[in-house]
């Protein structure tokens, strides 16, 4: 896909959102079932069933997916797609690229071993290794706009309010 095709594809969507801003507000959903056997949650992905369990550092077997890894994978996926879309829109040719994310967790926090240990990632690092002949100023612009428009990156960075409820069934 080139910049003209991307613009043509997105133009009617952008026009609709400009004309009716409420049409741009979409509710994304995820759902999982808590299993009676084992310490797992089966997440419906729309493509397959993903079974998440405890990370080995908190007693898990390592056979199930780890939610922390899934968070990083969502960041990599979103950042990669966003980078490619922005590069396409800016006519920055990319021959290939790798997107990688990593972060440290102190498992004492989630295991309740130390009250001063935070629960969650201390820091996340996101890296793009791309094969291109584009000049550095264009790559700087590409990175800036990728950060600006990546939904998962902005969500992690901004930390929106999260409402939690529990209901008896």
Question: Predicted regions: what is each one?
Answer:
Residues 1-73, 83-169:
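Extended beta-strand/beta-hairpin segments
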């Amino acid at each position: 896909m080139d910049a003209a095709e991307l613009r043509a594809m997105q133009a009617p969507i952008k026009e609709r959102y400009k004309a009716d801003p409420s049409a741009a507000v979409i509710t994304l959903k995820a759902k999982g079932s808590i299993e009676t056997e084992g310490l797992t949650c089966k997440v419906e992905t729309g493509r397959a069933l993903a079974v998440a369990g405890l990370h080995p550092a908190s007693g898990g077997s390592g056979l199930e997916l780890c939610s922390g890894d899934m968070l990083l994978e969502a960041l990599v996926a979103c950042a990669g797609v966003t980078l490619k879309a922005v590069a396409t829109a800016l006519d920055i040719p990319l021959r290939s690229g790798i997107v990688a994310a990593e972060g440290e967790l102190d498992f004492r926090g989630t295991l309740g071993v130390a009250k001063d240990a935070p629960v969650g990632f201390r820091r996340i690092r996101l890296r793009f290794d791309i094969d291109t002949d584009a000049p550095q100023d264009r790559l700087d612009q590409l990175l800036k706009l990728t950060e600006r428009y990546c939904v998962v990156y902005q969500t992690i960075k901004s930390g929106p309010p999260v409402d939690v409820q529990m209901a008896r069934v």
